[in-house]
C-alpha cells in the first residue's frame, strides 16, 4: 500500500471513530433525557397528589373555621335579640320567668 492510501485510510478510520463517539454520546444523552422525563412525570404525579391532599385538608379546616365563625355570629345575633326582647318586655312592665337555683 502506498503512503497516500495509508494516510487516507487512517483519516477515514479517525472519522469513523469520531462518528461512533458522537453517536454513543447522543445515545447516552437520549437515554438520560428519557430517564429524566419519566422521573419528572413521576415527580409531577406525586406532587399533584400531595397538592390535592393538602387542598382537601385546607378545605376541611376552612369549613370548620367557617362553621365556628357562623356559630359565633348566630350566638351574638340571638343574644342581641334576647336583650331587645327583654327591653321591650320591661317597657311593658313584664319580664321573663327565670328559675333561681
UniProtKB/Swiss-Prot annotation:
Subcellular location: Cytoplasm, Cytoskeleton, Cilium axoneme; Cytoplasm, Cytoskeleton, Flagellum axoneme
Gene Ontology CC entries for this record: axonemal A tubule inner sheath; axonemal microtubule; sperm flagellum
Main localization (coarse): cytoplasm
Keyword Transport: no
Sorted UniProt keywords: Cell projection, Cilium, Cytoplasm, Cytoskeleton, Flagellum
Gene Ontology BP, a term: flagellated sperm motility
Source organism, top-level taxon: Eukaryota
Function text: Microtubule inner protein (MIP) part of the dynein-decorated doublet microtubules (DMTs) in cilia axoneme, which is required for motile cilia beating.
Quaternary data: Microtubule inner protein component of sperm flagellar doublet microtubules.
Full protein name: Cilia- and flagella-associated protein 141
Organism: Mus musculus
